[in-house]
UniProtKB/Swiss-Prot annotation:
Its EC number is 2.7.2.3. This is Phosphoglycerate kinase. HAMAP family: Phosphoglyc_kinase. Belongs to the phosphoglycerate kinase family. The gene is PGK. InterPro entries: Phosphoglycerate_kinase, Phosphoglycerate_kinase_CS, Phosphoglycerate_kinase_N, Phosphoglycerate_kinase_sf. GO terms for cellular component: cytosol.
Amino acid sequence: MLSKKLTVDKIPHMIKNKRVLVRVDFNVPIKDGKVADPTRIVSTLDTINFLKENGAKSIVLMSHLGRPKGVRQEQFSLAPVVPALEDIIGQKVNFLNDCIGTEVEGEVANTKDGNILLLENLRFYLEEEGKGVINGEKVKADPTKVESFRSQLTRLGDLYVNDAFGTCHRAHSSMVGVNVDTRAAGFLLKKELDYFSKVLEDPKRPLTVILGGAKVADKIQLINNLLDLADEMIIGGGMAFTFNKVLNNTPIGASLYDEEGAKTVHGIMEKAKEKGVKIHIPSDFVCAESFAEDAKFAYKLKMKESQDGWLGLDIGDKTIRSFDEVIRRSNTLFWNGPSGVFEWKNFAKGSHAMLQAVTESTKNGTVSVCGGGDTLNLLKQVDGAKENISHVSTGGGASLELVEGKELPGIKALSDIN
């Protein structure tokens, strides 16, 4: 249960004079030796400030950057993060040139009260991920060395805080191997847990799930798990053509068709019927002569009228109105995937209309949670859209696995609330 995990706001009385080891996600883009986008650093500020305000003896930050695959490579050093981190928190940060070892332990033990330290990239060691590449060969870490690595990390803190949701689906040493008594979620991770529990554990009804994406096969676990939870489900994106062809035997021209996923469509519909979930698929589309931004296109072209060679790239006006009604009668929304090729202006209308319906519903009290890279890119196209969604997940693969019903190792490793 996500809502039963210990969060840092529950333990202010335990922080004073303690060394707090914090797993953050500073996997930020570096350009010309500087941080190009500090968003992930900024997102940890609430947790760092809370630990400072409650008298932590020291705050030891650990992270990965890039994919060095178990070998020290200076291009993946966390050193360039330090100036950006200092600007954001308004305090000097001591950067350590390693993440384990006697020198690191000595620095942490002897640091002045109130200091913040940043360890070097965890993934310079095979033992963090448990595998890597050495001299072009894939290798697995020695289990004995993994245990030693985890023990050395554990010696750096009295308390452990995890604020790296995006890595919670990985059973990496820094996520599951810090063996201290108190292991709490930071504020960034807490927000993810709070909002996903509102979708997965205690949603305000009706709960509507909006799914896009190219292939049914890629979303089958997600769909199956959400059918146990949802009241209504909207199927958009490339998946819609597979559903239409299988269920209605409609010609789809050159539109995307997922042969593997097609085998699962009837099973999905049977489960939906059994669970009482209404599934909505598009009834009209915007089609193009070819898959190109400047292709000749036609509005409101029903698929049964679609010429061979044409392909659907967005939903049509009738579908927009239908989906709009479903969204606006919902009290909880989970959105993963746009309805069309929104990157191209001629095929963005459907996705933008759905975004408008979601944001306006949110303003009226609906709880809305969005996740997935394409959905986030859509939000970036519209000024102020992100601020009008209840929660935009930073998790990527972690949020996807959570909604698929999987237990995330990084969350499982947190202490339970007593």
